[in-house]
Amino acid sequence: MKLALLRGVALALALSATSFGVSYAANPDVGGAPMSESKNIIENAVNSKDHTTLVAAVKAAGLVETLEGKGPFTVFAPTNEAFAALPAGTVDNLLKPENKAMLVKILTCHVVAAKALSTDVVAMAKADGGTHIVDTVGGCKLALSVQDGKVMIKDEAGGMATVTIADVIQSNGVIHVVDHVLLPKM
């Protein structure tokens, strides 16, 4: 009897942990904080100590409600270090109310209106001969490629970003942490 009960408990645990036979890796921590698949992009981003500049910019741009929405969204999320690498004074200037339109343009160049995991990006790039062009919510065109097993993103200004943490699943999409702010044509 005890053996049958143990088997039943083991089976129930196995099914709940593998979602009917398909197992998923746990979300990686980002900025020292756990990321919950049941929370939306904003609910998770505010917990990352590496994304305080991004969160402040999203708030200043009035994009919180959008990124809390249903989605799905893929967000290429630049770190604080990525913003700090911009020319001196750029972030402070962009956060001024009179520069909101430019801030919105830059931030929405980091958002794709679809859920694209890194495996999807790899497959699309391979199918397109090595580089896949994607349109962002902000009207930018990003060139996605894979180099040495890492997803690379070329922005319209010619800058290159590397995905440093991929596939952070959200309730409304996915975040890929990047090491460079993606810029539109200026």
Give, region by region, the residue ranges found by the protein language model.
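Bacterial N-terminal signal peptides that target proteins for export
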Residues: M1-A10
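C-terminal segment of classical bacterial N-terminal signal peptides
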Residues: L15-Y24
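Mature, structured domains of secreted/extracytosolic soluble proteins
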Residues: S23-M186
